[in-house]
A protein has these predicted regions:
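Short acidic, low-complexity intrinsically disordered linear motifs used
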Residues: 1-13
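Long, well-structured alpha-helical subdomains associated
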Residues: 116-128, 135-191
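Polar/charged side chains located within well-ordered beta-strands of beta-rich proteins
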Residues: 11, 22, 94-98, 151-154
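Zn2+-dependent metallopeptidase catalytic core
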Residues: 14-46
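Active-site scaffold of zinc-dependent metalloenzymes
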Residues: 46-84, 93-100
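Post-HEXXH active-site segment of zinc metalloproteases
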Residues: 83, 99-129, 133
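Acidic, low-complexity, intrinsically disordered interaction modules
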Residues: 79, 84-87, 104-105, 134, ...
Length: 191
């Protein structure tokens, strides 16, 4: 319940940024012939996920975040290939699942608040690997086999960024004094 006010504030502020999967694919530039397959897959597997697309107001290169059990936000400002933005949407949507399944807040946020770097690094690797596995498998199912074959290692680079993320979160927690993880994310992206 403590996160409810954060969710309501986010929803109130950003309903204008809510996009359908069809709108997302169009705005990020996915080729028309691929869209029906992706839309069908998304509607079967991710229909509960609400997608927000807008330019983040952040000096940090944050590409996307999840903001609850079924809310993701993607940074429209960062230049990246269309299939990478779709990968990012899938990756963040898996973080929604992880949050619903439990353990995410304790491993990802509470460890930073408590200064437990080692526990954070282990949880971070596990959560990111799982989200990447899901996104890569989903991209293959949506017709991006070739792209995943060529780019999987690069797309998995975030799995090795735990130290950087820990430091950024630590600094931001001290600077903005968030009430919870979602408040931190909201403040990081300028919502």
């Amino acid at each position: 319940m403590k996160h409810l006010s954060t969710f309501k504030l986010f929803e109130r502020l950003d309903n204008s940024t809510l996009v359908t999967i069809e709108q997302l694919l169009e705005r990020i530039g996915i080729p028309n012939p691929m869209r029906p397959t992706i839309v069908s897959w998304w509607n079967q597997n991710r229909s509960e996920i609400r997608i927000h697309l807008f330019p983040f107001n952040s000096p940090q290169p944050i590409a996307g975040v999840f903001l609850g059990e079924n809310i993701i936000a993607l940074n429209e400002r960062l230049p990246m290939p269309p299939h990478v933005k779709l990968f990012l949407a899938l990756h963040e949507s898996r973080h929604c699942d992880q949050h619903r399944e439990g353990g995410f807040m304790e491993g990802y946020y509470d460890t930073v608040v408590n200064g437990d770097r080692e526990s954070f690094l282990q949880a971070y690797r596990d959560f990111e690997r799982d989200a990447n596995d899901f996104a890569i498998q989903s991209m293959r199912a949506c017709g991006f086999e070739r792209e995943m074959n060529f780019e999987e290692m690069r797309l998995r680079g975030n799995e090795r960024a735990g130290d950087m993320v820990y430091q950024m979160m630590s600094n931001d927690i001290q600077r903005v004094n968030p009430v919870d993880f979602f408040d931190l994310l909201k403040k990081q992206i300028g919502v």
